[in-house]
Amino acid sequence: MNALYISLSLIQFLVGLGAVVCGAMLIAVPSGTLLQMSPERLQETPFSDFLVPGIILFLVIGVGQVAGSVLSMRKHRFAGYFGAAMGIGLMIWIFVQVNMIGGRHILQYAYFLAGAVETALSCLIQDHLSATRGRREAVSGS
């Protein structure tokens, strides 16, 4: 069980760290040049620059994943639920990104896979917690 929490926490921390750094870079320079991204990629999107995507990346994906990592490291009772939500959120983020600007980089697919693994680990953790709780209730006669 410890391996599940450690694996989940590590994935969340790495994804979160990358999102915080890249989100901060997009907020600092919304043209995207710090990340070698051209605003032309946004032509068919609702955005004229990378400021709003940078804010979302920083706050939702970055801060959310780091918070999830802390919950997982502490084996918090909601780590599974939060991790599943963040994993699904990451997959949605990548899906929308690929559909808006195209799938041009292998990292997009790697992050989608990370979201899927995060969701699977979270479900395994939550399933284990639910089974443990069920056994405790059966033993106590509730």
Which residues does each predicted region cover?
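Topology signature of small-to-medium multi-pass alpha-helical membrane proteins
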Residues: 1-142
